[in-house]
């Protein structure tokens, strides 16, 4: 499946718009793990534990997005937008949302 943040794909013609598709992932934060991660992992302003969780959430959201597009018969998604947000009491959870337009394309 072709994925693009732009409204079209170079070298392809959009033949049909199938609809808007979305993917979401909400991951809870482990307080003790996060505390120790802040001590152990933060080197040069980066936290390996947080980066791993972000990557995991992003993969889940994109998988949902592609599954919805496939269910609509699409072979590409254009106009993809990816957002991150903390939710829950004291920002205890991470939410990743991704959306785009499922389309059928041909060369």
From Swiss-Prot:
Q: Which Gene3D superfamilies match?
A: Hypothetical protein apc22750. Chain B
Parts of the chain that traverse the membrane: none
Q: Which Pfam families match?
A: YbjQ_1 (PF01906)
- Name the InterPro entries for this protein: UPF0145_dom_sf, UPF0145_YbjQ-like
Protein family according to the UniProt entry: Belongs to the UPF0145 family.
Q: What is this protein called?
A: UPF0145 protein ECA2666
Task: Please report the organism this UniProt entry assigns to the protein.
Answer: Pectobacterium atrosepticum (strain SCRI 1043 / ATCC BAA-672)
């Amino acid at each position: 499946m072709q994925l693009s943040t732009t409204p079209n794909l170079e070298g392809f013609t959009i033949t049909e718009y199938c609809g808007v598709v979305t993917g979401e992932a909400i991951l809870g934060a482990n307080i003790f793990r996060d505390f120790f991660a802040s001590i152990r992992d933060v080197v040069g302003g980066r936290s390996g534990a947080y980066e791993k969780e972000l990557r995991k959430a992003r993969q889940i959201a994109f998988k949902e997005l592609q599954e919805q597009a496939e269910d609509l018969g699409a072979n590409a998604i254009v106009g993809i937008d990816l957002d991150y947000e903390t939710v829950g009491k004291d920002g205890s959870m991470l939410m990743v949302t991704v959306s785009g337009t499922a389309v059928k394309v041909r060369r």
